[in-house]
Amino acid sequence: MQMKYLIPIFFLVLIVADHCHAFIGMIPGLIGGLISAFKGRRKRDITAQIEQYRNIQKREAAELEELLANLPVY
């Protein structure tokens, strides 16, 4: 990411954090992200995260079906 895009985003987050104190905890992560972007680190592998999310959804659906199958019918 280029510097001209990162600086306005950083200032926008600072303005939001000034108005909403819930975003204060987000500032250290943002600074770390900016440092990583300047060092040129690659983005995380999104495909692995998507696959992990799908596996969790399948597991939760199977657990829900098993739970509903074990409930008595009234």
UniProtKB/Swiss-Prot annotation:
Negative results: does not show antifungal activity against Candida glabrata (ATCC90030) (MIC>400 uM). Expressed by the venom gland. This is Antimicrobial peptide ToAp1. Antimicrobial peptide. Is able to kill Mycobacterium abscessus subsp. massiliense in a dose-dependent manner. Has antifungal activity against Candida spp. and one Cryptococcus neoformans strains with MICs values ranging from 12.5 to 200 uM. Also shows an inhibitory activity on C.albicans biofilms at high concentrations. Shows low cytotoxic activity and has weak hemolytic activity on human erythrocytes. Shows anti-inflammatory activities, since it decreases release of pro-inflammatory cytokines, and increases release of anti-inflammatory cytokines. It comes from Tityus obscurus. Keywords: Amidation, Antibiotic, Antimicrobial, Fungicide, Immunity, Innate immunity, Secreted, Signal. GO terms for cellular component: extracellular region. The modification Lysine amide is found at K39. Belongs to the non-disulfide-bridged peptide (NDBP) superfamily. Short antimicrobial peptide (group 4) family. Residues 1-22 form the signal peptide. GO terms for biological process: defense response to bacterium; defense response to fungus; innate immune response; killing of cells of another organism. The keyword Magnesium does not apply. The keyword Cell membrane does not apply.
